[in-house]
Amino acid sequence: KEGTDLYGIEAAYTADTYGVAVAYTSLDNGTSAETTYWGVNGFYDFDLASISVGVETEETSGTDKSGYFVGVTFPEVGPGSVSVGLGTQANYADADPEYLTYEASYSYPINDGMTVTPGVYIKEAATGDDDTGVIVKTSFSF
């Protein structure tokens, strides 16, 4: 019986105001179905905001799927920063419906070692009953 083989490679470049990364993965699960993934993402920092984008493709036995995300952060909104983003929930085929997830958050530094980030998200659903959630993340640095 053949086992599962997984190979991957990633290359990235980062400068002061921008960065880009490319990733490739090949998954052979021991059957005739081999899956390959390609991903490209990057960011650019403007004076007033930074933007991040990414795209991923997946090919399994002739079926192509893709997904993407985009996010924007405004670093100087009051004492904290505001982030908004949207992206596909997973890779989807061209003929499939595209369900998105939207998110927004505000990161507020309490002191030099603690940051609180409240946020909200909306996740579209095929049934029309979208999921909505609220989160609060607390980060500590020592």
Where are these regions (language model features)?
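CBM-like carbohydrate-recognition segments
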Residues: 103, 107-109
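Loop/turn elements at helix/coil->beta-strand transitions in domains of secreted/extracellular proteins
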Residues: 80, 113-114
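Detector for outer-membrane/organellar transmembrane beta-barrel domains
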Residues: 8-101
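Outer-membrane beta-barrel "beta-signal"
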Residues: 108, 114, 120, 130-142
